[in-house]
Curated annotation (Swiss-Prot):
Name of the protein in question: 2-succinyl-6-hydroxy-2,4-cyclohexadiene-1-carboxylate synthase
Gene Ontology biological-process annotations: menaquinone biosynthetic process
Quaternary organization: Monomer.
Similarity comment: family membership: Belongs to the AB hydrolase superfamily. MenH family.
Gene3D superfamilies recorded: alpha/beta hydrolase
Pfam families, per the entry: Abhydrolase_6
InterPro entries from the UniProt entry: AB_hydrolase_1 (IPR000073), AB_hydrolase_fold (IPR029058), SHCHC_synthase_MenH (IPR022485)
Organism in which the protein naturally occurs: Cronobacter sakazakii (strain ATCC BAA-894)
EC code(s) of this entry: 4.2.99.20
The entry's keywords: Lyase, Menaquinone biosynthesis
Keyword Hydrolase: no
Gene designation: menH
C-alpha cells in the first residue's frame, strides 16, 4: 500500500524529482524548508509508516518499508528521482538503493544515516535497547519519553530551548505507531550495507553536521563524498537549512 505523500512541482523548469524521507519522529514537513530553496526540482515529501499521514500504516521490517516506498513512487508515476533521507530516512534510502530494483534512481543523499552495524552482538544489543524505547512509548507520557530521547548522546549539541521545541513539535505523534516503527526499523534489524553501497552505480553523497562526531566518523568509513554542514550537530538540515540547501543544489545540478 502506498504511503501518504505530498507532491510539489518545481518553480522553474524541472530537472527531475527529489524524494524526501524524514527521520524518526518527523513527517513530510521536515525537509520543506530545505526543499523550498531547491527550485529546479519537483519534490515528493513522504510520511513514513507510523508518522504523519501514514500513522495508520505499519511496517514489519526494512523490506516491507521498501515495498511501501516503491508503491508510493509508482502511485505518483515517479520514473526518475534522487532520494534524500535523514537518519531513519537515510537508512531506508540506503536500503532502497541497494536492493537492485531501482531503475529510476538517479542519486542518493544521506544525512546522518547509519550504514549498518557490522557485529551481530552489537545488532542484538541495539535491538534490545530499541525494544525498551518502544515499551516506554507504550507506557509513559510521550513528552516524558521525548525528553529522554533528545538527551541521548547523539543529540548532545541541542540547547535546552532546541530540545523543548522538538518535544513540543513531536508530541503530536501517536506513541503506539512510533513504537511499532521503532522496532521494525531498529538498526538491530538492519543488514550492514557497506558492501552493496560500495557497488552503487549512481552518485552517493553523505551530509553531516560538523559537530556530529559519531556520524562524521561513520561517514569516513564509506569512502563517498562527505559534505560537512557548518555549526550543526546531528540534525543538520534543521540547524542550518541554508547550508544544506546550498549543498544539495550543488549536488543535484548535473
Amino acid at each position: 500500500m502506498p504511503l501518504t505523500a505530498y507532491f510539489q512541482p518545481a518553480r522553474a523548469a524541472a530537472r527531475g524529482t527529489v524524494v524526501w524521507l524524514h527521520g524518526f519522529l518527523g513527517d513530510h514537513r521536515e525537509w520543506q524548508t530545505v526543499a523550498a530553496a531547491c527550485v529546479e526540482h519537483n519534490h515528493l515529501f513522504i510520511d513514513l509508516p507510523g508518522h504523519g499521514g501514514s500513522a495508520h500504516l505499519c511496517a514489519v521490517d526494512f523490506a516491507h518499508v521498501n515495498e511501501q516506498l516503491i508503491a508510493t513512487l509508482n502511485s505518483y508515476n515517479i520514473l526518475e528521482y534522487w532520494l534524500v533521507g535523514y537518519s531513519l530516512g537515510g537508512r531506508i534510502a540506503m536500503f532502497h538503493a541497494t536492493q537492485g530494483n531501482t531503475p529510476g534512481l538517479r542519486g542518493l543523499v544521506v544525512e546522518g544515516g547509519h550504514p549498518g552495524l557490522l557485529n551481530a552482538d552489537e545488532r542484538d544489543a541495539r535491538f534490545v535497547a530499541d525494544k525498551q524505547w518502544a515499551q516506554r512509548f507504550h507506557d509513559e507520557p510521550i513528552e516524558t519519553v521525548l525528553d529522554a530521547w533528545y538527551r541521548q548522546p547523539v543529540f548532545a549539541t541541542l540547547t535546552d530551548a532546541q530540545r523543548q521545541e522538538l518535544i513540543t513539535l513531536r508530541a503530536c505523534n501517536a506513541p503506539t505507531a512510533l513504537a511499532t516503527m521503532l522496532e521494525a526499523t531498529s538498526p538491530g534489524r538492519q543488514p550492514p550495507l557497506y558492501e552493496p553501497l560500495a557497488r552503487l552505480s549512481v552518485p552517493f553523497h553523505y551530509l553531516c553536521g560538523e559537530r556530529d562526531a559519531k556520524f562524521r566518523a561513520l561517514a569516513a568509513t564509506l569512502n563517498v563524498p562527505l559534505h560537512l554542514i557548518t555549526g550543526a550537530g546531528h540534525n543538520a538540515h534543521r540547524e542550518n537549512p541554508a547550508a544544506v540547501a546550498c549543498c544539495l543544489n550543488a549536488i543535484l545540478r548535473p
